[in-house]
């Protein structure tokens, strides 16, 4: 793979795909049923949301961590301080540490 800055993450037919800047799929990762994806600001990892959980992936396609927040997931993204915001369907959610532990609910 080239530099990780050359890649984006798209959802295609319910599966996260690592793509080049032109949208050509390089690798499909994770389970089917993905709803959205977001890249960390340092581009070290990307997070993929599913209905009941969130997965953090590396650019080689390997999974770094699975977080099961205990609620239906509306979406997830990286915030500062190496935390992940997981939004709950219907409102609320939580800030989760990179290791998967809950930091703060909202």
Where on the chain are the PLM-derived regions?
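A structural signal for the main folded, soluble domain(s) of proteins
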Residues: 53, 59, 63-69, 73-77
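N-terminal targeting and processing segments
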Residues: 2-23, 28-32
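Short loop/turn segments that connect beta-strands within the blades of beta-propeller domains
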Residues: 4, 12-14, 21, 42, ...
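A short beta-strand motif characteristic of beta-propeller blades
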Residues: 24-30, 62-68, 102-106
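Repeated scaffold domains used in trafficking and secretory/extracellular systems
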Residues: 1-4, 31-43, 69-81
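Low-complexity/repetitive intrinsically disordered segments
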Residues: 1-7, 96-99, 106
């Amino acid at each position: 793979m080239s530099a990780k800055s050359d890649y984006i993450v798209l959802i295609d037919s319910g599966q996260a795909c690592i793509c080049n800047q032109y949208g050509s799929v390089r690798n499909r990762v994770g389970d089917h049923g993905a709803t959205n994806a977001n890249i960390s600001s340092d581009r070290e990892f990307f997070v993929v949301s599913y209905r009941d959980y969130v997965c953090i992936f590396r650019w080689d396609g390997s999974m770094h961590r699975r977080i099961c927040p205990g609620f239906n997931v509306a979406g997830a993204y990286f915030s500062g301080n190496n935390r992940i915001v997981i939004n709950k369907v219907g409102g609320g959610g939580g800030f989760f540490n990179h290791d998967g532990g809950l930091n703060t609910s909202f």
